[in-house]
A protein has these predicted regions:
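Short, ordered coil/turn segments that flank beta-strands lining enzyme active or ligand-binding pockets
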Residues: 10, 61, 70
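Conserved short histidine dyad/triad with adjacent acidic residue
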Residues: 21-24, 34-52, 87-90, 112
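Ubiquitin-like/PB1-type beta-grasp interaction modules and other compact soluble beta-rich domains
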Residues: 2-3, 54, 73-76
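Short beta-strand segments in beta-sandwich/barrel cores
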Residues: 25, 46-47, 64-68, 82
Length: 112
């Protein structure tokens, strides 16, 4: 399982950090959630700079996403990848559905 944390750094920019579940046992325990929503994005669909609206898991079920960060880097994630979105402030990030398939995600807002 691959989990990537998307968070706001002290520089006000969003950053990515790979989380190893073996080193983060809290990821392997039951976490309270508010529900689940399924979303679909057609290939090429782009969302300009934005923040995560709340702490949430975003799991790509189908297709691929490209996440853009303030340092100019682009990162691609495909089916089965889990993002823990925690960049609630600062510059935020961009997202684009890439590849030939639509992107289908399951978003699980966390209860804090």
């Amino acid at each position: 399982m691959s989990i990537t944390r998307l968070y706001t750094g002290s520089d006000g920019r969003s950053h990515l950090e790979d989380l190893d579940p073996a080193a983060h046992p809290e990821l392997l325990t039951l976490q309270a959630a508010k529900g689940i929503v399924f979303r679909s994005a057609e290939p090429g669909q782009f969302h300009d700079w934005h923040h995560a609206p709340r702490r949430q898991y975003v799991i790509t079920l189908e297709g691929e996403v490209e996440i853009g960060l303030g340092d100019g880097t682009l990162h691609r994630f495909g089916p089965g990848h889990v993002i823990l979105a925690e960049d609630l402030s600062g510059q935020g990030h961009t997202t684009r559905a890439v590849g030939a398939k639509r992107r289908l995600t399951a978003t699980i807002p966390l209860a804090d």
